[in-house]
């Protein structure tokens, strides 16, 4: 269990190419407490049966960190093509789904997860899985104070496939099926919750997955402020 000043994430990426094994990155971030981070990192390395291929430590101010994708760009360039003629950021075609976990995944759960990674790699298909630590300030807010329904989660999982814009439609349809299938594979270990910030159109019980027991209250608010559903999408909150 990390101190609340630290945040960590395990990022597993693979290209679906025989000559490139899946790559695991462990990221730890600290707001100003460098010595604490370094000590925790050393303690963690001592527990590993193997050593990392490479390590690096980077210091950023807050603004730089929030604009990481815009490193080396002027502000007019740090935009998408439809936002500025000078834009240099590019959109991607993405399929994404997610899970929340209230406890550590068992060995059987990890084997199930890695089995799916291996299968997709052998099929020549790329992808990524992010395991992101929660707790800390997230869990310190009472569950009924905001619409976010996953305050008790220990960590989240994000299942991702990212391709260039214009990627083959059948390839992206298959990617959407795979990321959603990961929820089925991990169902025995997860809470059943899902991360709202990118919706998964294949989640059937989306209102429960995104909002949990908050959905009815959100329906009441929707009915009060947007009864005609001016703001709407397929998995949007329906007014009470």
Question: Can you annotate each of these PLM segments?
Answer:
Residues 1-240:
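Soluble FAD-dependent oxygen oxidases
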């Amino acid at each position: 269990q990390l101190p609340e000043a630290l945040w960590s994430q395990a990022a597993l990426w693979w290209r679906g190419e025989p000559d490139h094994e899946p790559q695991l990155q462990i990221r730890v971030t600290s707001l100003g407490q460098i010595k604490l981070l370094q000590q925790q990192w050393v303690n963690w390395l001592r527990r590993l049966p193997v050593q990392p291929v490479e390590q690096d430590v980077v210091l950023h101010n807050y603004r730089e960190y929030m604009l990481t994708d815009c490193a080396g760009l002027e502000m007019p360039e740090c935009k998408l093509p439809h936002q500025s003629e000078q834009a240099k950021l590019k959109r991607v075609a993405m399929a994404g789904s997610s899970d929340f976990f209230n406890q550590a995944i068992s060995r059987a759960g990890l084997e199930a997860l890695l089995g799916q990674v291996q299968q997709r790699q052998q099929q020549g298909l790329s992808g990524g899985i992010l395991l992101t630590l929660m707790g800390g300030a997230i869990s310190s807010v009472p569950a009924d104070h905001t619409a976010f329904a996953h305050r008790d989660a220990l960590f989240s999982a994000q299942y991702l496939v990212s391709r260039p814009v214009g990627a083959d439609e059948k390839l992206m349809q298959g990617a959407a099926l795979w990321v959603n299938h990961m929820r089925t594979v991990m169902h025995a270990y997860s809470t059943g919750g899902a991360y709202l910030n990118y919706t998964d159109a294949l989640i059937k019980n989306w209102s429960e997955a995104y909002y949990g027991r908050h959905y009815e209250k959100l329906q009441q608010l929707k009915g009060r402020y947007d009864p005609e559903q001016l703001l709407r999408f397929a998995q949007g909150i329906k007014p009470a």
